[in-house]
Amino acid sequence: MTAPRRLRKELSDLQGNALKSFRDIKADDDNLLRWTGLIVPDNPPYNKGAFRIEINFPAEYPFKPPKINFKTRIYHPNIDEKGQVCLPIISTENWKPATRTDQVVQALVDLINDPEPEHPLRAELAEEFLKDRKKFVKNAEDYTKKHSEKRPAD
């Protein structure tokens, strides 16, 4: 299956699945290789907001992994200030062409709901998460209230 055919199918499948944690999924009108969507986490401290992401697929997809970037700022040890994500499923060494976008999105939602401080992009947040969870949760909640997008109504 060619990249455009596979991407159209995956986009259609994702849009039809009505995932509560990934909404408003669309491809760029001029570029099927660029998608946007809204991550809607279930767990505190992120469950008071929603986070816009962009998924960029390489022309060689599915043989090369997509890249995910957060467009909404988030206080999270695995996502840096530029919105880059440390997500093992899409690392070059772990990527498998059979991996579908819905699996990638689910791994991302799981990471948001359950940070992995042992693989941080922001060491200071990982340290705070490990040493003072209460402070981390308060900071993340405040940051989410200030910077996140409004959650869609169910």
Curated annotation (Swiss-Prot):
What is the stated purpose of this protein? Ubiquitin-conjugating enzyme E2 that acts with the RBR family ligases LUBEL, ari-1 and possibly parkin. Accepts ubiquitin from the E1 complex and catalyzes its covalent attachment to other proteins. Appears to be involved in the selective degradation of short-lived and abnormal proteins. Functions with ari-1 to control the subcellular localization and morphology of muscle nuclei (myonuclei) by regulating the protein levels and distribution of the LINC (LInker of Nucleoskeleton and Cytoskeleton) complex.
Name assigned to this protein: Ubiquitin-conjugating enzyme E2-18 kDa
UniProt KW Ligase keyword = yes
Pfam families named among the record's database cross-references = UQ_con
Phenotype of gene-disrupted mutants = Nuclei in larval muscles (myonuclear), are mislocalized and often clustered, likely due to mislocalization of the LINC complex, demonstrated by the aberrant localization of the complex member Msp300.
Biological process (GO), any one: protein polyubiquitination
Quaternary assembly: Interacts with the E3 ubiquitin ligase ari-1 (via RING-type 1 zinc finger).
Record InterPro entries: Ub_conjugating_enzyme, UBQ-conjugat_E2_core, UBQ-conjugating_AS, UBQ-conjugating_enzyme/RWD
The EC number on file is: 2.3.2.23
SUPFAM superfamilies noted in UniProt: UBC-like
| Keyword annotations | ATP-binding, Ligase, Nucleotide-binding, Transferase, Ubl conjugation pathway
Family note: Belongs to the ubiquitin-conjugating enzyme family.
Active-site residues, record numbering mapped to chain: 86
Where the record annotates domain UBC core, the positions are: 2-149
Can you quote a single GO CC term? Answer: nucleus
